[in-house]
Structure formats: structure tokens, C-alpha cells
A protein has these predicted regions:
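Ligand-binding beta-strand-loop-alpha-helix segment within the catalytic cores
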Residues: 121-125
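Short, solvent-exposed secondary-structure boundary/capping segments
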Residues: 111-119
Length: 267
């Protein structure tokens, strides 16, 4: 069991791909999500690939629910594979519940690395009703990027009702399995984002949430090519290629879970 952080998003990683290594890992691996460090946002479990990738990634949220994809987790897995010498200079191919994703190394640093993860194409979702809270109606866009996301525009994300509204929207009729809710604001000439993640709550960063916010900005004509999103855990960049695929760029590093704050405070 090893600890990794992607832009402040913390994960426990367990590699079960090799039979002998898998047995040793399983002996030390958390029996359930409740056994992971309280400060971890989820568990990244590597198992043998099914269709020729370097690994298959199974993502479990803090509450035990399954996530189809995770941009910050993908970069952490990519760093792990690069550090083990499994990839070399090529991009890692990682199978997820949302399909195959690629991760490539941008540059190394003393405290970690910057990596670029392919996030697939965004699929817009029509909302059946407006999003309102305490008499305020929000400008909202919904999108699927492996996981469902709802992006709300706010004047100042620091004052947004993230916990209250994020929790209430988990029962929104358009998202029967829950939804990640982003609160996006333009402040100090930067885009700032807070995300209430389904199965976790508010986190220091959400990679697919940053991609959803960048997509919403592009649809609104306020972003193109590359969009930078500032979150509590750091800055993430989202690129669009001509085919419409999104790429998430940000840091990843290995950390000792024993040194993580527990329980973790709000971002």
C-alpha cells in the first residue's frame, strides 16, 4: 500500500497485477475503504489488463462506491508506472471503467512530476429542471466524462454552498447514481473551482471536475485550446485536441500516508 497525491487529491495505491506481488500486496492492502487512511480520498487498485493495456485501474471512493474515471488518480498511476521503469518514454495505457486512458510524462521534478492524462470526450447532458438554492437560480451545465458532472457558475466559490447544495444535488432526478458538483468562479483573472464529489464530499482537487469546468467554459465561448483551473490543491490545465478529446495536465507525487492529516480539514 502506497500513498500518492495528484494536485492535493490523495489516494492509496495497491498493485495486484503480479501473482506473487499481488499476494504480498493483498496481505497489506486495506480490507475495505474504512481501513484506508482517513485523509485518503479513495483507493487506486491495479489489476491485470483485459485488452492489452499496461494495467487496469479500479477506483473506489471514500464511501466504498466505484468511480469510472479519475484524472488525478490516473496521473498518480502513471507516475507509479514510470518510476518502476515499466513505461520508458512512451505513454502508459491504463484501462478504466470509462475506457482506455493514456498518461504521459511531461517533466520530472525533485518532489514529483507533471503528467498529462487523456480524459476522453465530453458528452453534454440536458437538465430537466433548473438548479436553484434559497431563491437563487444558477447557470448550470451538465456533462459526462466517464463520471457525471454538474458545473454551476457562482460569483465567488469561497462563499458558495458547496457542502449543502452538493449534498442535496446527489438526489437530482437527472443523476440517479449521484453527481460531482463543481462551483466555478472567475476571480482575480483566474478560474477558480471547488468540487463536491459523489461518494467523497469536497476534495482539494478533482481532475475530471476541472475538465468538466473547462468544457462548460468552451461551450459558453469563454475558453478554447487550453484552460487553467485553480483549485485548493493546485492548478490544473485542460487541453482540447482537434478531435474533441480532453487532456488533463498537473502534478503527481508519492507521499507517506502516515503523514497525512486525519481527519482531513475542508479545503
Amino acid at each position: 500500500m502506497r500513498g500518492f497525491s495528484g494536485a492535493g487529491n490523495r489516494f492509496v495505491l495497491v498493485d495486484e497485477r503480479e501473482e506473487c506481488a499481488g499476494a504480498a500486496q493483498r496481505a497489506r492492502a486495506p480490507r475495505s475503504v474504512r481501513d484506508t487512511p482517513a485523509a485518503a480520498d479513495g483507493t487506486l487498485r491495479l489489476v491485470p489488463p483485459r485488452v492489452g493495456g499496461d494495467a487496469r485501474l479500479e477506483i473506489t471512493n471514500r464511501d466504498g462506491s466505484r468511480a469510472a474515471a479519475c484524472g488525478n488518480g490516473l496521473r498518480c498511476v502513471g507516475l507509479y508506472l514510470f518510476e518502476r521503469g515499466e513505461i520508458g518514454a512512451r505513454a502508459a495505457r491504463i484501462e478504466t471503467d470509462a475506457g482506455e486512458r493514456t498518461v504521459e510524462l511531461v517533466r520530472r521534478g525533485l518532489a514529483g512530476a507533471v503528467l498529462r492524462a487523456g480524459m476522453g470526450r465530453a458528452e453534454g447532458v440536458s437538465l430537466s429542471s433548473p438548479v436553484e438554492h434559497e431563491g437563487e437560480r444558477f447557470s448550470a451545465r451538465a456533462v459526462r466524462l466517464g463520471n457525471p458532472h454538474l458545473v454551476l457558475r457562482v460569483a465567488d466559490e469561497r462563499r458558495a454552498p458547496v457542502a449543502v447544495l452538493g449534498r442535496r444535488l446527489q438526489s437530482h432526478p437527472d443523476f440517479p447514481d449521484g453527481v460531482n458538483v463543481g462551483f466555478l468562479a472567475r476571480r482575480d483573472e483566474r478560474w477558480h473551482l471547488r468540487v463536491f464529489e459523489r461518494g467523497v464530499g469536497e476534495t482539494h482537487a478533482c481532475g475530471s471536475g476541472a475538465c468538466a469546468a473547462a468544457w462548460a467554459l468552451c461551450v459558453a465561448g469563454e475558453g478554447a485550446g487550453c484552460v487553467e483551473i485553480q483549485m485548493a490543491g493546485g492548478r490544473l490545465s485542460v487541453e482540447f485536441d482537434p478531435t474533441g478529446e480532453l487532456f488533463l495536465i498537473g502534478d503527481a507525487r508519492e507521499e507517506d500516508p502516515a503523514g497525512w492529516e486525519s481527519p482531513r480539514g475542508r479545503p
